[in-house]
């Protein structure tokens, strides 16, 4: 995760702003600079290589002292920064909006995946600039649209029906902020269209999840799509979701947290996110993740008869 201000800076032109991507040498200068505390939140002028991000975001970049940040010296950083600028320059951002826009915390890996989709000649985003920019505006939280299958970050499609598409995420192969844990495995489920979904299509998805992904929890980050994650990683997801939710509220970026379909979401996660939305502390919310829940009446009782036992998945074992 990183703020948009880690990728670009605003330049006032008439009554609107044009966004310009940072270059890696300017960032490198900023990372080595001694800056007064009162100037930590201001864009840094490297003198030689142009404007750099505010020093308060130093920890967002990979250095000798911090291996958890972005690999900003890779070509992928520039591609992501340029893509963000293209999207922001396609809309009007005024002086009253610019601080709010740049403070938004975004998924770096999501943006890298959109770059990969853009470069894939077989992908619809390669052929449609309008759809590409829509996808980016959704990814950076500037659009009220939800991420659907056409505008999704992408990955490897492992399941699809008339209503849903399930993707295996490819973060292990990333350049900008790769997942280093070689045991990482995670999926994302997007709706094909933002419209009511028939019960039969929900049934098909739940049957697939029960049999092929029975070692995983179905959760949501509140953005209109589902994530299918290992139970061992749920607490980590909870920390990130809670931090992003609080950060957005603090910065005035109030975005409705979409709880999604309770029949699909893991019961404990639904309780966690509901508690978070009510304003409870992280400690109180996380207790619900490990609490034994009263099993609710199953609207799809009998689904287990839809598959033979030899079809039960070994994924995640």
Swiss-Prot record:
Its cofactor is Mg(2+). It comes from the Viruses. Homooctamer. Interacts with VP1; this interaction is weak. Interacts with NSP5; this interaction leads to up-regulation of NSP5 phosphorylation and formation of viral factories. Interacts with host DCP1A, DCP1B, DDX6, EDC4 and EIF2S1/eIF2-alpha; these interactions are probably part of the sequestration of some host SGs and PBs proteins in viral factories. Its EC number is 3.6.4.-. Belongs to the rotavirus NSP2 family. GO terms for biological process: viral genome replication. Keywords: ATP-binding, Host cytoplasm, Hydrolase, Magnesium, Metal-binding, Nucleotide-binding, RNA-binding. Transmembrane segments: none annotated. It is an enzyme of class 3 (hydrolase). This is Non-structural protein 2. ATP binds at residues 107-109, 188, 221-223, 227. GO terms for cellular component: host cell cytoplasm. Residues 205-241 are annotated as: RNA-binding. GO terms for molecular function: ATP binding; metal ion binding; nucleoside diphosphate kinase activity; ribonucleoside triphosphate phosphatase activity; RNA binding. It holds the Pfam family Rota_NS35_N. It comes from Rotavirus A (strain RVA/Cow/France/RF/1975/G6P6[1]) (RV-A). Participates in replication and packaging of the viral genome. Plays a crucial role, together with NSP5, in the formation of virus factories (viroplasms), which are large inclusions in the host cytoplasm where replication intermediates are assembled and viral RNA replication takes place. Displays ssRNA binding, NTPase, RNA triphosphatase (RTPase) and ATP-independent helix-unwinding activities. The unwinding activity may prepare and organize plus-strand RNAs for packaging and replication by removing interfering secondary structures. The active site is at 225 (for ntpase and rtpase activities). It is found in: Host cytoplasm.
